[in-house]
Design a protein with these regions (language model features):
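Single conserved hydrophobic/aromatic residue that forms the stacking wall/gate
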Residues: 1-7, 11, 202-203
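As written
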Residues: 7, 19-20
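Conserved protein kinase catalytic core
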Residues: 12-13, 31
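Active-site C-terminal subdomain of aminotransferase-like
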Residues: 22-169, 173-200
Length: 204
């Protein structure tokens, strides 16, 4: 009942509607859209029954010594009237212990990207289809990997969950194997070879 959505269509997928209880998403990719800030988000649907199999969730049901013995599974519903002990514990314990929070400036940058998310995702998906179709005409490419391909491992799920666009990630297998791939990367002039994805920039 978890959904890790870093590389998927963030605009219309809505994993909670399909049964996910907790959704984790990278803010650095499509949401930020500009690659200037690193961040992530956790969304707790409040739909998960933490009372079942309590032994599997000791962080929720065992007394937390760092909070005077509080039992999050009991305390959060009593104090807030909500079923979100996971996200409350994440905020007050993990945030306290790890300091994993955005600075005000990085938060501002993420919000700036969020304002144009719906427009960018639609265009990302349209562009990806065009690029896929173009790459399929190249005699230097062995295979184009995309979620809509009939032989794609992801096609069934893409058709089921990605109603407003099939995502914007494209993979290719070059003829010539590893050496051809190295040569391709080394000779890029327009594209940047980076680890990040989902930006309004040209990356590979």
């Amino acid at each position: 009942q978890w959904s890790s959505s870093a590389a998927s269509d963030v605009y219309k997928r809505q994993p909670i509607e399909h049964g996910a209880a907790i959704v984790m998403h990278s803010l650095t990719k499509y949401i930020g859209g500009h690659g200037t800030s690193i961040g992530g988000i956790i969304v707790d649907s409040g739909n998960f029954d933490w009372s079942k199999n309590k032994s599997r969730h000791p962080n929720i049901w065992e007394p937390d010594k760092s909070y005077h013995g509080a039992v999050w599974g009991d305390a959060v519903p009593q104090l807030t009237g909500t079923n979100i002990p996971f996200i409350i514990r994440s905020r007050v314990v993990l945030l306290r212990d790890l300091g994993s929070t955005l600075s005000p400036f990085n938060s501002f940058q993420i919000i700036q990207g969020l304002e144009t998310l719906s427009l960018r995702i639609k265009q990302h998906c349209k562009n990806a289809l065009k690029v896929k179709e173009f790459l399929e005409t190249s005699d230097k490419i062995e295979k184009v990997i995309f979620s809509t391909n009939q032989d794609s491992f992801f096609k069934e799920n893409a058709d089921k969950y990605l109603k407003e666009g099939k995502g914007a990630l494209i993979g290719i297998e070059l003829k010539g194997g590893l050496e051809a791939g190295k040569s391709f990367i080394d000779n890029l002039k327009l594209f940047y070879h980076v680890a990040n994805i989902g930006l309004s920039l040209i990356h590979i």
